[in-house]
Design a protein with these regions (language model features):
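Catalytic domains of carbohydrate-active enzymes, especially glycoside hydrolases
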Residues: 24-49, 286-288, 434-436
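Outer-envelope exported proteins of Gram-negative bacteria
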Residues: 44, 210-212, 216, 290, ...
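N-terminal regions that are enriched for targeting/export leaders
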Residues: 1-11, 27
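Surface-exposed amphipathic alpha-helices with a cationic face
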Residues: 34, 197-205, 330, 354-355
Length: 505
């Protein structure tokens, strides 16, 4: 069945309190998607972000981002008073997230909510909370990790005292006793996060909207995952990485990309029958309806750079687990529900892996306009319907911003191919050819629908600061744009069967 939808991260939803949340505006967006005839909502990783604010660098592969908890919902639950959060100036410009202000104020407000939550329990743990803790065994390690980070002034676990860094049994036991209340606070945050998330997901599903989630291939070094299971990563005896992940120099980057993530010990993971990955994918498939796996080609082969290197020069390619991993994942978690982000160097070996896995790959229109007309990303050259076409992604400029930075020859080719005369017509033309392509799924962004330029870009890869900040406003979700998309979706044979609308929370 042909489908289509919008890529819009939770953080980018409108909201008075600094960042998009799983509150009223998220439900309004589901309603807007339904009115626009859409069946897919794609988001970025829901993970708790670390100091760079990137959802692809998280303190845990399991923990949700507490910033997405709706403060208004907590007020409805009796855990907050309105003035306790409404009187705070969360941001200067509603178009952009101010992460410094969020960090300064959010956890203070949540401590107030936690205090009331703890008192309301009166020593008797609610059945819902008890069930949540029992169903999520990762919570204990994660909450201890966060409590210890607080105790160490936010420092990476790599800088903690030796006994805790190496997870000495006695030291860990003592820390759990000492920081029990702080661990409870972080467990409370996760309880509220997932409580709100699954209610929102159910509402979306009840209204015919599937959620496409996203998981990074690698963990951050400063994460509970690496701290707790160092044997699964290429670390030395002192838990220092021997090699880190990245990408070699190419036409787009003279020094390559130095991501800095520790690399998996794939031999050890295979010995454990990929237990860690099966657990991760099982969790992701519960969290989302469809899972996009970032940097899929890294499972075929990965680029390893010596730890401490300043650039990506001098790294080496090594074989990844290839289909062996995905064969186990399919057997243990089911066959479907995965999108492979297969952008990059597509070798015959990568093509073989994609064919074996049978996951849909990605086609990004901004890569399509080689003046020869032979690009595999150009819709006329698609050889399979088993793919997802994107007008742009979180790592690219908007269609308009991209076009404005092209050379004159390529601009002319784009105009001729799309049949447009002016740059302002480009975003709609991109959406049109994506929707009318043979790809099973077609995705665009709110930036494209609104015709925004580079000012609305979410992320510039390999740069630090000023990323992941852009947000929508209520005024962006117009009846006119919904009607346009609804009609295009209908004539493109992507419109889902009509379902009776479900009520909000």
């Amino acid at each position: 069945m042909r489908k289509s939808g919008i890529l819009l991260h939770i953080a980018s939803l409108p909201n008075k309190y600094g960042i998009g949340t799983m509150g009223r505006e998220a439900y309004n967006f589901v309603d807007w998607l339904r009115s626009a005839g859409q069946s897919l909502w794609q988001i970025l990783p829901l993970s708790q972000t670390s100091f760079g604010d990137s959802p692809y660098q998280s303190f845990s592969i399991y923990a949700g981002n507490p910033y997405f908890i709706s403060l208004e919902t907590l007020e409805e639950e009796g855990l907050l008073k309105h003035n306790e959060y409404a009187d705070i100036n969360w941001c200067k410009d509603p178009r952009y997230i101010d992460y410094a202000t969020m960090y300064e104020n959010f956890y203070k407000v949540m401590r107030l909510a936690f205090g009331r939550f703890s008192k309301a329990m009166n020593g008797n743990v609610s059945e819902e909370y008890k069930a949540f803790v029992a169903e999520n065994p990762w919570l204990e390690n994660y909450t201890l990790f966060m409590a210890l980070k607080d105790a160490h002034g936010g420092k990476s676990w790599c800088e903690w005292e030796t006994l805790l860094r190496l997870r000495d049994v006695t030291a860990v036991y003592s820390a759990k006793k000492k920081y029990a209340k702080d661990m409870e606070f972080y467990a409370f945050l996760q309880f509220e996060f997932f409580r709100q998330w699954y209610k929102l997901k159910k509402y979306a599903n009840d209204n015919g909207i599937q959620i496409i989630g996203d998981i990074p291939i690698y963990c951050a070094l400063d994460s509970a995952d690496v701290w707790c299971e160092p044997q699964l990563f290429q670390l030395d005896r002192d838990r220092v990485p021997t090699v880190v992940a990245g990408f070699p120099p190419d036409a787009f980057s003279e020094d390559g990309q130095l991501w800095g993530n520790p690399i998996y010990d794939w031999d050890r993971m295979k010995q454990e029958n990929y237990r860690w990955w099966v657990g991760r994918m099982s969790f992701a498939k519960k969290l989302y309806d469809i899972v996009r796996i970032d940097h899929f080609i890294g499972f075929n082969s990965y680029y390893a750079i010596l730890f401490g290197s300043k650039t990506a020069h001098g790294g080496e390619w090594h074989d990844g687990p290839k289909y062996d991993l995905f064969n186990v994942i399919k057997r243990e978690t089911g066959k479907g529900g995965i999108i492979a982000e297969d952008l990059g160097i597509i070798t015959p070996s990568v093509r073989k892996l994609l064919k074996q896995a049978a996951y849909p790959g990605m086609k990004v229109l901004q890569f399509a306009f080689d003046p020869t007309g032979k690009s595999e990303y150009l819709p006329q050259n698609y050889t399979s319907q088993n793919c997802v076409v994107y007008t742009s992604t979180h790592d690219s400029d908007t269609a308009l911003g991209w076009f404005n930075n092209l050379d004159r020859t390529t601009k002319q080719f784009v105009k001729e191919y799309l049949g447009v005369r002016h740059a302002a017509e480009l975003p709609e033309a991109f959406i049109d050819i994506a929707w009318k392509s043979t790809a099973d799924m077609a995705m665009t962004t709110m930036q494209e629908l609104c015709g925004f330029g580079t000012e609305a870009r979410i992320n510039v890869p390999s740069t630090i600061g000023n990323n992941w900040r852009w947000r929508t406003l209520d005024s962006d979700f117009t009846a006119k744009s919904a009607a346009y998309l609804d009609r295009l979706t209908e004539i493109s044979n992507r419109k889902p069967p009509v379902k009776k609308s479900r009520k909000k929370r």
